[in-house]
């Protein structure tokens, strides 16, 4: 039984998240463009570790749902994301809450029958103009930006940053990593700096 069905059918309201990614060639250039577009730095470069969980048989993956425990600096968050809609932008409903003890939450999830299915790591900066958010991610498979806000705002912001619609990426990091593995024939099983470096040698 998928226990998340019970979770979803509670009275909690799910917020909607609309976003796109694009690849970044030069981090300094994109930061300069963000400054020029009126963005301010919300969060300095911070280490982030993400663990996705699933039930036996990959129940969530088959339904294109996601359960993630994230450590961002010293903070922890637990997030559930629905299947969502993929068009020019990616839109998914989500539930998210802060967690005071990430290791305890990991133990709770395992006790409920979930197990880690994928880990991915990055360094992230967060920028905002009070209408939406742009994050700059340094990952083991390259650098990316993520623009999150209303669809119209996303397109306007992308234009300011010199990003065309053809450059939009709506795939998540797990999918991007799987594609990268096929292209590079890497043996890495998770998207962490140490494992990717070892698996790519």
Name these PLM-found stretches.
Residues 1-13:
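N-terminal amphipathic/basic-hydrophobic helices that include classical n-h-c signal peptides
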Residues 41-42, 154-156:
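Short loop/beta submotifs within extracellular cysteine-rich repeat domains
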Residues 11-132, 167-201:
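N-terminal strand-loop-strand beta-hairpin
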Residues 3-6, 47, 164:
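Intrinsic disorder/low-complexity signature
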Residues 152, 158-164:
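A hydrophobic, small-residue-rich beta->alpha segment in the mid-to-C-terminal subdomain
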């Amino acid at each position: 039984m998928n226990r998340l069905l019970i979770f979803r059918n509670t009275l909690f309201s799910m917020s909607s998240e609309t976003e796109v990614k694009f690849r970044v060639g030069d981090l300094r250039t994109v930061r300069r463009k963000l400054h020029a577009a009126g963005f301010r730095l919300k969060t300095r470069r911070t280490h982030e570790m993400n663990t996705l969980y699933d039930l036996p048989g990959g129940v969530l993956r088959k339904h294109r749902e996601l359960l993630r425990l994230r450590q961002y600096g010293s903070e922890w968050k637990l997030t559930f994301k629905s299947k969502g809609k993929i068009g020019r932008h990616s839109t998914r409903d989500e539930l998210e809450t802060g967690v005071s003890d990430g290791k305890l939450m990991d133990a709770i999830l395992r006790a409920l029958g979930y197990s880690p299915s994928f880990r991915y790591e990055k360094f992230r900066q967060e920028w905002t103009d009070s209408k939406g958010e742009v994050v700059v991610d340094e990952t083991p498979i390259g650098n990316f930006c993520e623009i999150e806000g209303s669809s119209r705002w996303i397109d306007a912001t992308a234009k300011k940053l010199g990003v065309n619609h053809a450059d939009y990426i709506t795939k998540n990091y797990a999918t991007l990593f799987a594609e990268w593995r096929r292209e590079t024939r890497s043996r890495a099983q998770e998207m962490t700096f140490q494992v990717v470096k070892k698996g790519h040698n």
